[in-house]
Amino acid sequence: MQLVQLLPPGVSLLALVWLAVDAAFLTALLLYLQRGCDSGRSLLCSVFQDLIRYGKTKSGLRRPSWLQWFDIPKRCFWHFYFVSLVWNGFLLWILLHLLLQSVPVPEWLQAVLQFLCAGSEPQVLGGELSVVLAFSLLWLHSLRRLLECLFVSIFSNGVIHFVQYCFGLGYYILIGFTILGYCPLDRRTAVSLDDLLMQGNWYHILGLTLYVWASLHQYTCHCILADLRKSASGAIINLKHAVPTGDWFEKVSCPHYFAELLIYLSIAVVFGLLNTIWWLVVLYVLLSQALAAVLCHEFYHEKFDSYPIHRKAFIPLIF
């Protein structure tokens, strides 16, 4: 607890962690856009390029052979969503038992949240429905992405860095703490399901609508990418890359990344736009997906001479 006491008033350790993550990805994005650390310039630049790339954007990259020791198959992406499904499902189960049956939160979990969230904004009373919905949307998103990784996506032999893999696992654990930390956990009386539903507001409907819309488009885009490697009968015929077309691909190179941002924005809306720390999560998603989209956009332009020049990388008409 001494570490928390050293933090500025009103700032939690959790907020500082997200700020540090945001700063790291902003630095990486700006450094890449300024071409300040091209691969091969130095050993440090080679490591930098290896850390920011994954999958197809690593192909053709000049890499020291020893960096391949840290390669993990990209098809292991499903591990992230499995961890999120189990962990955040567990936290949602604890939250529902607290709210509906007054079952106390385990002491170890209270201690962790106290350590991470001490000094943060006051927890919002009457916002339990927002927290339940946020957890539910995150859990459903993890379930859908897990099923897509296992049954829709067709992975090539692309790789991710071991650091990226570890970060991805930790990310979904930290997300759970971030959502749960927004709800008061010291309540002594249960609420009924009707009480929760009475908290419903316009922003819950708006957030759910945005979530469904973005999720449908993301699923469609993942199906389009998978179909590029299938025959008309559905058989896998190659693992090559091709120019995707249809749906939001007509506007941007990486619409599935744009949809990911909208999904996290929808959860911010479900919180009534009031969860400050969640906005730091949204900022991370914006920066990380922007970096990945720029790398992917450049890959398409370098590989395909006839690639549509009107497409943006990430956000339609903007970036």
UniProtKB/Swiss-Prot annotation:
Membrane topology for this entry? Multi-pass membrane protein
Arranged from A to Z, the UniProt key words for this protein are: Endoplasmic reticulum, Lipid metabolism, Membrane, NADP, Oxidoreductase, Transmembrane, Transmembrane helix
* Domain of life (superkingdom): Eukaryota
Lumenal face: residue ranges?
A: 34-79, 144-158, 217-266
Its catalytic activity? a di-trans,poly-cis-dolichal + NADP(+) = a di-trans,poly-cis-polyprenal + NADPH + H(+); a 3-oxo-5alpha-steroid + NADP(+) = a 3-oxo-Delta(4)-steroid + NADPH + H(+); androst-4-ene-3,17-dione + NADPH + H(+) = 5alpha-androstan-3,17-dione + NADP(+); 17beta-hydroxy-5alpha-androstan-3-one + NADP(+) = testosterone + NADPH + H(+)
Look up the EC number in the record and give it. 1.3.1.94, 1.3.1.22
Recorded family membership: Belongs to the steroid 5-alpha reductase family. Polyprenal reductase subfamily.
Q: What is this protein called?
A: Polyprenal reductase
Q: Which gene encodes it?
A: srd5a3
